[in-house]
Amino acid sequence: MQTKGLILFDIDGVIRDVTNSYRLSVQKTVLKYCNWEPSTYDIDVLKNEGIWNNDWDLTLELIKRFINKNKLSLEPPSRDNIIKNFEKLYFGCHPNESHMKWSGFINNEKLLVDTKFFDFLNLNKIRWGFVSGAELPSAKFILENRLRLNNPPLIAMNDAPDKPNPEGFLKLANKLLEKDFGPNCPPVAYVGDTIADIQTIINAKELYPSQRFISIGVIPPHLKTAENFQKQSQYESKLKAAGADLIIKSVIDLKNIHKELFKA
């Protein structure tokens, strides 16, 4: 089968809604250690700096900044303690336990796409895969158990350096296309909801300027409410300013623009 192009997807905020799971784990972990619960806007502000792709590091940074801003005589927790508390909230137990035992916030996650979407991509000769900073058990659970995808191509946490380092993205793209990057290689798109995702593609373009890479920003679910309309518009502007080639409201929108996306 001749490949028209390749689309790699982030998972959190793109494939699943993590408003009441990962983001809630961030909020409740910060609350535990400094008696302040950040809003989703506070989290977005930090993520928009483009370097806080790891939610554990983001959580610790929120705590440190709050302590410093308010001149509190508190000692920030260790990163290990952040991780332990975070995973207790998110999984409800150790992540290596059977997912049947998971009782945490992960059970709150809603899918933003269905299996038929990937059947559509296959039918249209578009290859696909996932590059995410999520832990492997969590990523595999959403892709294999919830979406019922068979052995989906995946780069997860610890498989490669954190975004915006493009190593994981380039590694999976090269593996799936089985070609050297360049003008004769099919276009490669990446769909993500943060500035770090956009910056990942900018960094990839710098390494392989003759390869066509496309950065696609998607609006995260927590902003898709009437009361957040202005914030949604501001967020979209930030993604564009960061260098996004295209902004979409939902991954499903790709079904309507896939032909234009990979047009020579």
Give the positions of each predicted feature.
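Substrate-recognition "cap/lid" segment bordering the active-site pocket of phosphatases
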Residues: 129, 134-189, 194-213
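Short, acidic loop-to-helix structural element flanking the phosphoryl-transfer center
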Residues: 3, 8, 91-130, 134-144
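Active-site neighborhood of HAD-like aspartate-dependent phosphohydrolases
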Residues: 1-45, 51, 57
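Non-catalytic pre-domain segments flanking phosphatase-related domains
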Residues: 1-9, 61, 68-84, 88, ...
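Helix-loop "lid/cap" segments that line or gate small-molecule binding pockets
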Residues: 27-33, 56-72, 172
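Acidic, Mg2+-coordinating phosphoryl-transfer loop and its flanking beta/alpha structural elements
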Residues: 190-249
